């Protein structure tokens, strides 16, 4: 089922931290720039960089409930009309500091 119109996702991707795309909409490719650092490249440019990026990762350690993933922007200028660059961070609550990690599942949605 597809939803088009105001407030619909303009792009989304279900990928691995290493750049393999499982499924996507309006995403040409995912590029691994380094550990926990990926670029999401859009098929069709978005009109400007005034969009919203949301993200989710799986649990990096599998069943260990004290280890979670954080999706954040790579920099203050990581959103462009042709794509965005994100960082995935493993945040384990009994270890510091958080570390960039390639998660098994990374989901990113873009809304405009």
Explain the meaning of each model-derived region.
Residues 18, 24-27, 57, 70-71, ...:
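Periplasmic/extracellular, small/polar-rich flexible segments of pilin-like filament-forming proteins
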Residues 61-112:
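Extracellular jelly-roll beta-sandwich "head" domains, especially the C-terminal globular C1q domain
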